[in-house]
Every structure is written in C-alpha cells, then in structure tokens.
From Swiss-Prot:
It comes from the Bacteria. Keywords: Cytoplasm, Ribosome biogenesis. InterPro entries: Ribosome_maturation_RimP, RimP_C, RimP_C_sf, RimP_N, RimP_N_sf. The gene is rimP. It is found in: Cytoplasm. GO terms for cellular component: cytosol. Belongs to the RimP family. One of its GO terms (biological process) is ribosomal small subunit assembly. Signal peptide: none annotated. Pfam families: DUF150_C, RimP_N. Required for maturation of 30S ribosomal subunits. PANTHER family: RIBOSOME MATURATION FACTOR RIMP. This is Ribosome maturation factor RimP. It comes from Clostridium botulinum (strain Alaska E43 / Type E3).
Amino acid sequence: MRKDMLLEKVEVLVKPIVEELSYELYYLEYVKENGEYYLRIYIDKEEDSISLNDCEKVSRRVSEILDVEDPIEDSYYLEVSSPGLNRGLYKEEHFKKFIGREVLVRFNGSLEGMKKIQGILKEAENEFITVEGEKELKIPTEKIKGANLEGEI
C-alpha cells in the first residue's frame, strides 16, 4: 500500500480517538529508520503543553484500535509525542496558526536565488505563504521542502 494511502487510513482510525481525548491530531508520519518502521503520531492542545501522561493516554487508546483494525502490514513501533518547540509546519492550517512567528523555510531547489529563508511568517493563503526575512518573499507551497517554527522559550 502506498504511504499516503496508509496514512489516510490510519488518520481515519486515529483522529476521532485523539479528538475524543480533547487533543488535536497535529501530524502523522510513517518512516523506516535503521531497518525499523515507526508510526509517529504528533498531538497538540490549545491550552498548555503536551505532557508524557498525555502521550501515554493517547498511545494506549490508539494502540487498541490499531491492534484491532491492523491497517499496517509491517511490524512497527508506535510513538506518540508533541510536535515540539521547533515543530514542523505541514498544512495550511499550521501556517495560519503561526502567522506572526519566526519560521525557517527550506525550498525544493531555489527560489529567487535562495535555498531557504528565515523570518516572520506574514501570510498563508491559497497555496502560498509570505515570509519577511532578508526580504519579503511569497512562496508557493509546492516549492516548500520543509518548514519549522524557530523556537521561542
């Protein structure tokens, strides 16, 4: 099964459980590292930060449904965690949520002679984001290789 289809299938199973427990399903990833497969579930919540207890609670409930439905053929490790301080920004809703914050955006190839830009996220609309760094740059989302918040403590 293709990875994107597998993640869609897992999201359909996992998202209702995560939301029932009053968390947001921030992001899912399924990766192979050092010969082992990992299903990583990143959770968030509006108020306060994610604790180890939050991750354990979600992990137990999600593990139950994944064991029953068994959407992943390979054996894998389940990891549940917070997106972290320098969280990745993957969806338009992530970019919109963090307008006004400092971000680092890396490009597929180059854009206006640059491979990346660090600056303040100004806008996120219609498959474009605008970042003000060395200069203000309007970036098509298909040119984004990766984007992260730059940490503030």
